[in-house]
Amino acid sequence: RTSKNNFYVLEDNLRVPSGSSYMIENRSTMMHMFPELFTKYNVKNVYDYPDLLQKSLIKCYSNFSHSPNLAVLTPGVYNSAYFEHSFLADEMGVNLLEWRDLIIDNNKVVIKTTKGKEIIDILYRRIDDDYLDPLTFNPDSLIGLPGLFDVYRSGNIMLANAPGTGIADDKAVYSYIPEIIKFYLDEKPILKNVKTWRCSEKNSLKYVLNNLEKLVIKEVHGSGGYGMLIGPTSSKSEIKKFREKLISRPDDYIAQPTIALSTVPILTEKGIFPRHVDLRPFALMSPNEIHVTNGGLTRVALKKNSLLVNSSQGGGTKDTWIID
């Protein structure tokens, strides 16, 4: 949000969106500390997210001959979002699996249990496309299941989100979203996009190079606040280095104006001060419905004057209320 009733979409995350568990944990903490507030105000519930996620995944399953066996596929305990993988699997009452827990048997994905082999019908995967299957994608992957993609292509397993959905995460594709909405739906977007210059285009690159100190530069495939430049808060040497990157690899970058994100008060060791925030809502889509959570993850930049709200960059989170 940049001003009252003025919201912008900063980016889309369709591949492995994370943060829903922290949304729920934030709510649990607030309810424990301030139960009287939830008694006084009719704050909408967020605890139903895992149940809605499970129902959405099952609704996407196309084989109706049996009740599907669902599991969560995680890169492992060293992944920064492992807590969430474990949390969601536990809340849904399904197995949390790594690639080493699985085998390919008769062109199906199978888990060995004390009761024998179980076929997995749906994998809610929390692994990036490149690492899903070393036989199909990155051969150096140590966290993917060899042969998984062949099973997927044969229709014997459902992967969610589907491989390839990450194209919508692409920051260059983001710049076309208003046109995509107009083309496919013949509608105008309800929420605005941030103006974006594609550095792959000659005139855009020229403008960006002449205005680096005013702009935010992002890697097209970047995430987590890495590989970006925030011009107004960067040193001359940092801007110089980024200029060289842009000139040598313009296709890898987009640029946007520096957005004045809204602020919320936070408690620091020196008192209460404003810090910049953004909101990450969660949407679940199945063939016949879309459900948007009654809340979301409000991410906050804990450092003074910082616009980086990513947890990987030292950001924090806040409980988000929707009041009925």
Q: Whereabouts are the PLM-identified features?
A:
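Domain-scale recognition of functional cores that engage charged ligands
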Residues: R1-D324
